[in-house]
């Protein structure tokens, strides 16, 4: 870190009042705080803090797109395919008959600034309000109606001040109202806390049942994701198994290793680069923090205000948590806590973290690249369908058997169904694959046609005459084996591959970059680089040079992949296919019955590093068989809408389609990925109109049929197939469009692949705009067809989405 950067860090640290996480930043006297605590002692309430950071879960509640599509108003379900009986990780929420949630506004005279004091004064009146109540500082929720619409209560503070509290009924909320849905989630988070589960990020974990992997210095906390929403058939809780990986070494250990590796001079710069942006866990309060900066001039001996006195960080942790800090010279970490300050104001200042007490969460890139670590982790985290279902059932049973949890639910007249939801899905038939002049079927249960395609010529592939292969001296044998095997496998595939010019480089990044600069010219069609390891920085440097500085198709392969002779034919075949694709080859196709159709895929990548820009990506099909694609990436500023940069890209794609086909597409179907919770409003209200503007720019009389589909891959929904007493993953092609879909959306799930281990993840498709009039059956079938067109694997996958993710 430069001297200027250190000065900025010092300025940020000094410019705001700082405190240890969990320390009370007093805005009033200690006697006043004590009075509040005494008044509120013994009262249980659902706190606003239990709602903190959760409101975005419900922002998509108000997006009602289905009502605008006449052809799916009555029914959005398909009928084709073979019915299949499934269970899903959903549990119905049950409530007593005529259940209503009563909402009250609470007013204090004189006004009380402290929300905590307001709660304490209000909850003095338990006889009037009852034991079950939820108060967020302004609104009071009760499971029963008070005798009068306006109830006036009187309280006295500890210092004798009289306070009048007016409680006014403002709303009677039915179980399906958005406020009630949010309220159910608040109550359930209360239940999870009763079960001694700890919130980390958006999920809850059980620190009392850790899974230790000592050989890798890792610990796994098992936990669950939970969301309660209104679905097609009922209000249900969707819950799935989650795992949080914690490292056994502290941030101080990592800093010591960095100092040893890079020396004192470069340590500040390297340390900041490695640590800033990472998430840490402080076990003394089980909270997570993002490292935003490093306070190079702060140590545990520095002090901060606690009440009216100054206390050092070292003494604070000793008195508050009984923790001894061994290294008094370690610098502190800065985390800009997002929580609001008193009365909704800005936070008083950043949290200062002691590295010795912080544990990194998640995995580093180096860990992810370590096969042994990932294999050992997967034995605990990659659950088979039967194990996952068993864990979910055990979770709900635990809630039902815990007396405190049941008492909390009983107070509100709520309960959960004891069993997973049963529903009926449909399995679409497998597709015929067309390759060259041949066609073939595949096993629909495995969704893999790598065997069937062997020995068959591809649809189209340009000859590869001028190409380079780079390798180190140590990897000479592996590189030669790859060249020879590529020659063997290319003939049957109809590929014409000449021998490459082989370039040897020293095994370090600078040497490889120089070798690329000296040898890659405009006449080179392809560059293959054999890497000695899967270090991300080396791979990134190759791709950056060959994508940005000297655009040339490239293929990287790790030498270890080539070291097993028995697998070399398979590996070489896959490499040959990828090389062909990158030069514009077409491998196989499926039957697409819709004519003059353009498929568009849109995604956005957000770099979480401070100050970095987002990247928007668009791909668009150019031919009937969906085997040729237009692609464009654009850099965007943070916060900029994705379509601002991609409007011109879509216009360019339409012009390319016109050149390729001598006509414009009569139908356009856009698959939009990368839409997070709470962002659906933006897609519906902004992006759709931007897409339409791009289309109009071609000509005012050009009005193709348009469909926009939001795709979500990272979802919690899981489905299980029971057969002869055994639990399996649903087969590829399974469609679910009832029960667990949302009533206000035209949405469906597709299981589009088979997995060898663990539980399969379905993909959620939400049609947010549609003038095509396609029946649900046709929309689902077309989407499944496109899943066959991802050329990186000879298996079914989410084609358009994966091409955007890979940047092909």
Regions found by a protein language model. Give the residues of each.
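Long, low-complexity, intrinsically disordered terminal regions
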Residues: 2-808
């Amino acid at each position: 870190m430069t001297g200027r950067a250190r000065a900025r860090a010092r300025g940020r640290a000094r410019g705001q009042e700082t405190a240890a996480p969990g320390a009370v930043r007093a805005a009033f006297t200690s006697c006043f705080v004590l009075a509040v605590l005494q008044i509120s002692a013994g009262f249980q309430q659902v706190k606003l803090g239990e709602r903190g950071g959760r409101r975005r879960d419900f922002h998509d509640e108000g997006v009602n797109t289905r009502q605008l599509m006449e052809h799916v108003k009555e029914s959005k379900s398909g009928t084709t395919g073979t019915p299949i009986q499934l269970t899903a990780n959903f549990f119905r929420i049950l409530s007593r008959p005529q259940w209503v949630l009563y909402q009250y506004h609470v007013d204090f005279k004189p006004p009380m600034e402290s929300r905590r004091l307001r709660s304490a004064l209000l909850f003095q009146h338990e006889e009037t309000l009852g034991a079950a109540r939820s108060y967020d500082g302004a609104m009071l929720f009760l499971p029963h109606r008070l005798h009068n619409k306006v109830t006036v209560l009187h309280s006295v503070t500890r210092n004798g001040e009289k306070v009048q509290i007016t409680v006014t009924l403002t709303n009677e909320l039915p179980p399906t109202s958005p406020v009630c849905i949010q309220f159910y989630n608040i109550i359930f988070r209360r239940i999870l806390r009763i079960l001694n589960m700890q919130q980390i990020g958006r999920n809850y974990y059980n620190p009392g049942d850790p899974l230790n992997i000592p050989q890798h210095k890792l610990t796994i906390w098992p936990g669950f994701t939970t969301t309660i929403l209104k679905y097609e058939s009922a209000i249900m809780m969707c819950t799935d198994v989650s795992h949080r990986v914690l490292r056994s070494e502290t941030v101080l250990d990592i800093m010591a290793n960095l100092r040893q590796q890079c020396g004192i001079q470069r340590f500040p710069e390297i340390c900041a680069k490695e640590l800033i942006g990472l998430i840490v866990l402080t076990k003394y309060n089980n909270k997570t923090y993002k490292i935003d900066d490093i306070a190079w001039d702060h140590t545990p001996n520095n002090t901060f205000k606690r009440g009216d006195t100054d206390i050092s960080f070292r003494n604070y942790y000793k008195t508050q948590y009984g923790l001894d800090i061994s290294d008094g010279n370690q610098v502190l970490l800065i985390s800009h806590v997002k929580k609001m300050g008193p009365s909704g104001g800005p936070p008083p200042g950043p949290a200062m973290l002691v590295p010795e007490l912080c544990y990194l969460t998640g995995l580093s890139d180096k860990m992810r690249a370590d096969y042994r670590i990932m294999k050992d982790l997967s034995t605990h985290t990659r659950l088979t369908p039967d194990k996952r279902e068993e864990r979910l059932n055990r979770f709900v049973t635990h809630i039902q058997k815990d007396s405190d949890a049941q008492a909390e639910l009983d107070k509100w007249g709520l309960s959960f169904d004891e069993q997973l939801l049963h529903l009926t899905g449909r399995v679409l038939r497998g597709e015929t694959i067309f390759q060259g002049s041949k066609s073939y079927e595949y096993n629909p249960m495995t969704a893999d046609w790598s065997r069937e395609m062997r020995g068959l010529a591809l649809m189209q592939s340009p000859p590869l005459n001028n190409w380079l292969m780079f390798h180190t001296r140590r990897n000479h044998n592996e590189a030669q084996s790859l060249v020879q095997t590529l020659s063997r496998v290319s003939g049957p595939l109809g590929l014409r591959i000449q021998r490459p010019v082989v370039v040897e480089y020293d095994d370090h990044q600078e040497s490889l970059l120089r070798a690329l600069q000296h040898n890659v010219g405009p006449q080179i069609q392809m560059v293959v680089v054999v890497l000695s390891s899967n270090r991300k920085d080396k791979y990134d440097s190759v791709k950056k040079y060959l994508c940005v500085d000297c655009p040339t198709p490239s293929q990287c392969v790790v030498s270890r992949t080539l070291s097993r002779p028995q697998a070399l034919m398979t590996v070489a075949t896959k490499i040959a296919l990828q090389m062909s694709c990158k030069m514009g080859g077409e491998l196989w196709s499926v039957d697409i019955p819709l004519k003059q159709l353009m498929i568009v895929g849109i995604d956005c990548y957000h770099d979480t590093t401070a100050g970095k820009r987002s990247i928007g990506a668009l791909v668009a099909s150019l031919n009937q068989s969906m085997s040729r694609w237009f692609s464009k990436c654009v850099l965007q500023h943070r916060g900029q809408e994705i379509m601002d940069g991609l409007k011109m890209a879509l216009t360019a794609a339409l012009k390319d389609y016109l050149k390729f086909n001598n006509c414009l597409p009569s139908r356009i179907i856009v698959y939009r990925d990368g839409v997070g919770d709470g962002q659906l409003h933006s897609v519906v209200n902004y992006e759709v109109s931007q897409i339409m503007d791009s289309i109009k720019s071609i000509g005012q009389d050009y009005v193709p049929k348009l469909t926009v589909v939001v795709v979500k891959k990272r979802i919690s929904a899981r489905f299980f197939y029971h057969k002869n007493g055994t639990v399996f993953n649903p087969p590829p092609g399974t469609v679910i469009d009832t029960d667990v879909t949302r009533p206000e959306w035209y949405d469906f799930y597709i299981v589009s692949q088979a997995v060898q281990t663990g539980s399969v993840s379905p993909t959620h498709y939400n049609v947010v705009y549609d003038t095509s009039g396609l029946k649900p059956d046709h929309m689902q079938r077309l989407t499944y067809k496109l899943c066959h067109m991802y050329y990186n694997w000879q298996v079914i996958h989410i084609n358009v989405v994966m091409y955007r993710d890979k940047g092909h």
